[in-house]
Design a protein with these regions (language model features):
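Carbohydrate-binding surfaces of carbohydrate-active enzymes
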Residues: 2, 6-230
């Protein structure tokens, strides 16, 4: 007498930004929203080769056991889908989010946000032709902009490395766009401080922490406030 346990028998899907994450030592591995794990029934409920192999094995061992044939869902072929609307994030930022002002950067949790993106904004005066910036303790992936021009992208362990930028004006706008790529949902890191997203310490210009930040929460739960009539860059 024995039994088998299939994990999983039926694949599934997480929607939106609820993808989750696996903890592996000091590294977090974001998961995709497809939750399949080579299941006998795939994400859309269709049988796979594994399903038919199990069916064959069961029929050989238990020939009298009735087995129904699974339904196969119809799907359309993949085609190119043209974009009808597009707009730059900076162009429509004020229509989709209102800034929260603080001296130092706040985490996503401190701002009452669970998932999505968070844009940090401040300004810096030009003291030299080149400035060294560092984002200290950020999660999970960042893009840094000077006057809305992309300068660098950093991910996980890269965050904290020096970013050298040219400041073209006397006063320059600094934007740091942070993406929350998923929190762990089991294991030793479940309640760890590393699961707090956004900038958890601060941003340094040379040896000093930058202050006077505006934070724009971007959960992206709705597109109703996006103004597509504005500029695309």
């Amino acid at each position: 007498l024995g039994s088998i346990n299939l994990y999983m028998f039926h694949g599934g899907t997480n929607f939106g930004f609820m993808n989750g994450c696996s903890a592996r030592g000091t590294i977090d591995l974001p998961q995709i929203t497809s939750y399949d794990y080579d299941a006998p029934l795939d994400e859309q409920g269709n049988p796979t080769e594994k399903y038919f192999a199990l069916q064959k094995m069961l029929h050989e061992e238990y020939p009298a056991l009735p087995q129904a044939e699974p339904l196969v869902k119809e799907s359309f072929a993949q085609t190119a889908i043209p974009l009808t609307n597009k707009v730059s994030l900076f162009a429509t930022l004020e229509t989709i989010s209102q800034p929260v002002v603080s001296v130092y950067p706040q985490t996503m949790e401190q701002l009452g946000q669970n998932t999505g993106y968070l844009l940090y904004r401040t300004s810096i005066e030009k003291d030299a032709a080149e400035e060294k910036l560092r984002v200290i303790d950020g999660r999970d992936r960042l893009q840094l902009f000077v006057n809305q021009v992309h300068q660098a992208t950093q991910y996980q362990t890269e965050i904290g490395e020096d970013i050298y930028v040219t400041l073209p004006q006397e006063n320059n706008q600094i934007d740091v766009l942070i993406e929350n790529m998923g929190r762990v949902n089991y294991g030793h890191k479940l309640f760890a401080d590393t699961q707090k997203k956004g900038i958890r310490t601060g941003v340094m210009a040379d040896l000093h922490f930058m202050t006077q930040w505006q934070q724009y929460c971007l959960p992206m739960t709705s597109c109703e406030q996006v103004d597509y009539s504005r500029e695309w860059q």
